[in-house]
């Protein structure tokens, strides 16, 4: 009871942030273990009220047997900008001709033109999203969010796009993966930027290290290999989903596999041993690397967003 009350004190009288939500959620779990389900349910309901789209609200909703949070429906109307539409056509022609630099200039002009209003920003973001230009859509979505755009599904669909949907779904299904999990992982790893390169050298949509890519390519019967292939979306999806499926087969819970994807299997196994529990929620809290801990939480939360918005559930 003392621990539960201490969690209450920390969470109920502090500014609203992720630590507050964690305190409320774990206070609920502590009260539940003490047999007071009424207080537990109150704490979990408070988490959902404060931040309905958060990781801890997702966990709380499960405890309360509620449906996960879904962004409210927004307007279906997106006002087209004739100048932007013409620029998009020019950019597509330039890209088809291999003139990527010139195409990027057109895209930059569209993004700059969209600054005049939140509505224009959202319209441009949706235009980019529809053309699988997810990184640009996300950037404009964040701009719209910071400018006061309504937090409805029209905004969230550009903040959480589903680019390369055909290849993503195909490779996810081939490896019996939840497409929403794959999309959430890519959203965190690269923002759907096929040319993304991390500071340690991971490449492509699913941020595969060249040495790992070589091993995966060999297992997938690639006759030739070049690390540059990791920048091709189809290749990244094929090898990345194979890698993720392999990790999932070796762990009891998706959170363990995500920790291994981010920090390596040797660390994930060591953390599992030190955690001393089969409870995946406790495991996540006990990951010693903040980067990996946040990584796992964000992907698990975003998986629910992708499921709710796109109906992608394996």
Which residues make up each language-model segment?
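Catalytic glycan-binding domains that act on GlcNAc-containing polysaccharides
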Residues: 1-2, 12-63, 67, 71-79, ...
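Acidic/His metal-coordination segments adjacent to aromatic residues that form catalytic metal sites
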Residues: 83
């Amino acid at each position: 009871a003392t621990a539960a009350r201490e969690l209450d004190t920390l969470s109920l009288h502090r500014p609203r942030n992720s630590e507050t939500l964690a305190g409320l959620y774990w206070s609920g779990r502590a009260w539940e273990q003490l047999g007071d389900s009424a207080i537990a349910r109150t704490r979990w309901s408070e988490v959902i009220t404060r931040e309905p789209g958060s990781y801890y609200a997702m966990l709380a909703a499960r405890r309360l047997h509620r449906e996960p949070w879904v962004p409210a429906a927004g307007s279906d109307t997106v006002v087209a900008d004739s100048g932007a539409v013409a620029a998009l056509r020019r950019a597509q022609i330039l890209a088809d001709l291999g003139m990527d630099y010139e195409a990027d200039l057109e895209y930059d002009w569209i993004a700059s033109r969209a600054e005049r209003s939140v509505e224009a920003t959202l319209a441009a973001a949706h235009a980019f999203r529809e053309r699988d230009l997810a990184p640009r859509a996300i950037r404009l979505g964040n701009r719209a969010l910071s400018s006061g755009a309504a937090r409805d599904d029209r905004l969230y669909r550009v903040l959480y796009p589903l680019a390369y949907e055909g290849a993503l779904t195909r490779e996810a299904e081939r490896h019996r993966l939840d497409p929403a999990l794959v999309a959430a992982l890519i959203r965190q790893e690269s923002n759907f930027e096929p040319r993304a390169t991390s500071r340690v050298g991971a490449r492509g949509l699913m941020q595969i290290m060249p040495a790992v890519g070589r091993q995966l390519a060999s297992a997938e019967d690639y006759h030739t290999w070049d690390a540059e292939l990791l920048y091709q979306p189809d290749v990244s999806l094929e090898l990345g989903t194979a890698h993720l499926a392999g990790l999932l087969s070796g762990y009891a819970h998706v959170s363990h596999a995500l920790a291994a994807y981010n920090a390596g299997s040797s660390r994930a196994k060591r953390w599992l041993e030190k955690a001393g529990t089969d409870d995946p929620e406790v495991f996540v809290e006990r990951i010693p690397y903040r980067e990996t801990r946040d990584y796992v939480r964000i992907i698990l939360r975003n998986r629910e967003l992708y499921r709710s918005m796109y109906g992608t559930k394996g």
